């Protein structure tokens, strides 16, 4: 690593520590030429799979789209931002863990419903009604009955 002070190539690592939830490494370095110390952070570059929509169109995974969909269902519900972030992280971890380059959008929708069901039943019904295109009140009732089982 080049020294940010004198641009020398020779630096040594003095200290390394895990930060975050073990997802990154903080390294304290010292330049062997000018003796200045500096800190670097290393994070693994994790690639999300592409999303295959129902019409076979492929698009990059969009975390913001996922977040907005969940937040819309959770609007005015008593769920903390931390709980939402944990649910989003669970979904992303699962998708990365598949090892697939592409995943169907249906899988993502089902993962969202699974997480919403754990977070808030009303938000789950809201999301399911749009995701599954409920046509009438009967379909709402059937889904609510399944939740109560």
Swiss-Prot record:
Give me the disulphide-bonded residues: none
Q: Which UniProt keywords apply?
A: ATP-binding, DNA-binding, Metal-binding, Nucleotide-binding, Repressor, Transcription, Transcription regulation, Zinc, Zinc-finger
Identify a single GO molecular function assigned to this protein.
zinc ion binding
Q: Which GO terms describe its biological process?
A: negative regulation of DNA-templated transcription
Cofactor(s), by name: Zn(2+)
Entry superkingdom: Bacteria
The ATP-cone domain sits at 49-139
Q: How is the cofactor bound?
A: Binds 1 zinc ion.
Q: Mind telling me which Pfam families this protein's record contains?
A: ATP-cone, Zn_ribbon_NrdR
ZnF (unnamed) intervals: 3-34
Q: Which HAMAP family match?
A: NrdR
Tell me what this protein is called: Transcriptional repressor NrdR
Organism, scientific name = Enterobacter sp. (strain 638)
Q: Which gene encodes it?
A: nrdR
